[in-house]
């Protein structure tokens, strides 16, 4: 091997190591901190991550008062300055069919392409959100319904169905546990 070839090879290897080391080192810095709770209930950041835009600080505005529940209480999750998720905590006296709610054009929880989900509570998943409901007796009513609506997603694509189902599988029962149902 000629000395110029050895120098070129050494420079190439050193450059490769610097690039890979930089990616490893700075890749961790770029990873943002996701919340470990959502609207007052613990949630795994790994379950929340696929539902949020990839960049921006995550914050929330939570108007849910579990001690004095209102018929409907919103909680909004922001990424940067934009709303990414809208959650609606609703207490009511009559049982509802979440599929009818999801299909109604008059509903604030209207979903695109809703289908029933194979989960313990009555749940529907759409391309842009999910609705779960269960019996939960409190001073605000005997039923509780949680709607999760994604903002800014294409309602014709089913990209978020699996992540929404994962969220509702774990998050909805955890929310219900915090409500003091009798």
Question: Which residues are covered by each model-predicted region?
Answer:
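Functional cleft and adjacent loop/helix regions within the main domain
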Residues: 1, 12, 52, 56
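Hydrophobic membrane-insertion alpha-helices, especially the h-region
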Residues: 2-27
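A small/polar (G/S/T-enriched), proline-flanked helix-loop surface module common
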Residues: 24-182
């Amino acid at each position: 091997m000629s000395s110029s070839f050895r120098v070129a090879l050494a420079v190439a290897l050193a450059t490769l190591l610097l690039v890979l080391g930089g990616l490893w080192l700075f890749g961790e810095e770029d990873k943002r901190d996701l919340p470990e709770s959502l609207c007052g209930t613990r949630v795994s950041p790994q379950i929340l991550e696929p539902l949020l835009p990839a960049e921006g600080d995550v914050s929330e505005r939570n108007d849910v008062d579990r001690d004095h529940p209102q018929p409907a209480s919103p909680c909004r999750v922001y990424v940067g300055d934009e709303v990414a998720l809208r959650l609606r905590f609703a207490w009511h006296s009559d049982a509802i069919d979440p599929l009818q709610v999801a299909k109604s054009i008059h509903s604030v929880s209207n979903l695109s392409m809703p289908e029933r989900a194979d989960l313990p509570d009555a749940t529907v998943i759409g391309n842009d959100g999910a609705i779960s409901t269960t019996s939960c007796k409190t001073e605000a009513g005997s039923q509780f319904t949680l709607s999760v609506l994604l903002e800014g997603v294409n309602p014709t694509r089913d990209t978020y169905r699996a992540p929404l189902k994962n969220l509702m599988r774990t998050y909805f029962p955890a929310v219900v546990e915090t409500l003091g149902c009798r």
